[in-house]
Amino acid sequence: AQTCFEGMKAYTAEDGRIVCFRPDLNAARMAKSCERLKMPVYPEDKFVDAVVQTIRANEAWVPPYGSGATLYIRPYMFGIDAVIGVKPANEYQFRVFGTPVGPYFKGGVRPLTVRISDLDRAAPRGTGDVKAGLNYAMSLYNIVDAHEKGFDENIYVDAATRTHIEETGGANVIFVKGNTLVTPKSDSILPSITRRSLVYLSLIHI
């Protein structure tokens, strides 16, 4: 039951170097997830080193520049005790694996057909702001239902009032109105590293 994870990608740059975007922020986010799930915090420097070692060991599997493909890196941690009771595990494993993946948007970037979900993804003061496996397991029914009905993704609104957009099942939401960038402020959505970077850049350049 105690499982948290991160996800990032290794890219081949135009000059041939292999790069990975801000793994230090993934390390910090996993530390927060571990604390919330009563798991021992994996040291952030060791997290980054494990990611770098995994990329180096799989360098031959990093797709070439211009292909749109990447090497997906998945660090994850989980309890391994053989216990029945509802309590934190005594032993844990931290692992990292990598696999080549194609472009996230197959066929290029295109508009998505989305729906406002009737179900809630996370509750106030719950676990929506950490990258816990349970959050994604709970959304499987809803995303399968959306696909069966012709939608690409679900838009989740706040569980308390159901009046404010929060995020999709797989990403944060950002709106651009003129020269203004607008993104939901909520304690029940995952703090996206991509969103953080876009907000930072917008403050400098917009």
Which role does the model predict for each range below?
Residues P23-K149:
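Extended Lys/Arg-rich, glycine-bearing segments that form polyanion-binding/interaction patches
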Residues T163-K185:
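Glycine- and Gly-Pro-enriched alpha-helical subdomains that act as flexible
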